[in-house]
Amino acid sequence: MGESPKGLRKGTWTTEEDILLRQCIDKYGEGKWHRVPLRTGLNRCRKSCRLRWLNYLKPSIKRGKLCSDEVDLVLRLHKLLGNRWSLIAGRLPGRTANDVKNYWNTHLSKKHDERCCKTKMINKNITSHPTSSAQKIDVLKPRPRSFSDKNSCNDVNILPKVDVVPLHLGLNNNYVCESSITCNKDEQKDKLININLLDGDNMWWESLLEADVLGPEATETAKGVTLPLDFEQIWARFDEETLELN
């Protein structure tokens, strides 16, 4: 088992054998290698005929050194596939597995071993000195906005100014005190807002200004009611109410 048949020729091929093998494949095509020795009369085994054709006699085979792109591709494929030369050669058109293997062993194996040694040394240095290349990084943290004492005092002391309209300009039966309020704010400077002040503490003015207190001196006009005021009577009435409250 496993022994070659007796009388088969081994070793290098002659030019006559190459011509016979080429003529047979041109006539019958590739494949059916067990019939090639019978058709050609060669004293060779089918495996020897197949390898001779695929590695040397096939017209599409490229000869010469590998270019830079092919070398780069061989390095990448060898890193993935290892020593599977037939698979690597299948990715290189026109290159045989034997050519790729020979080129690797003669040119690339030493370089590959040197690169592996360098990477191992670098990894050892990194693991032995992990903190040697560490750098300090300054972190800037946000700070809260601070206000000066002057600004805080100015903000507290800002109050709206109220201008009260005199009594003789705004009195009628239904007393309404109109005033203008000016707000000194940054966004609403120099703007007047007219509002109606209805304060419960000032409602006692209505009782002082009614017609039954002032008597028949009130005269009606087309615009409204005008009241001649007697301030002495008003203040006397005010004193009486304060005494009653006390």
UniProtKB/Swiss-Prot annotation:
PROSITE patterns the record matches: HTH_MYB (PS51294)
Protein's cellular compartments: Nucleus
Superkingdom of the organism of origin: Eukaryota
GO cellular component: nucleus
Every HTH myb-type domain range: 5-61, 62-112
Keywords: Activator, Developmental protein, DNA-binding, Nucleus, Repeat, Transcription, Transcription regulation
UniProt xrefs under Gene3D superfamilies: Homeodomain-like
Role description: Transcription activator, when associated with BHLH002/EGL3/MYC146, BHLH012/MYC1, or BHLH042/TT8.
Name listed for the protein in its UniProt record: Transcription factor MYB113
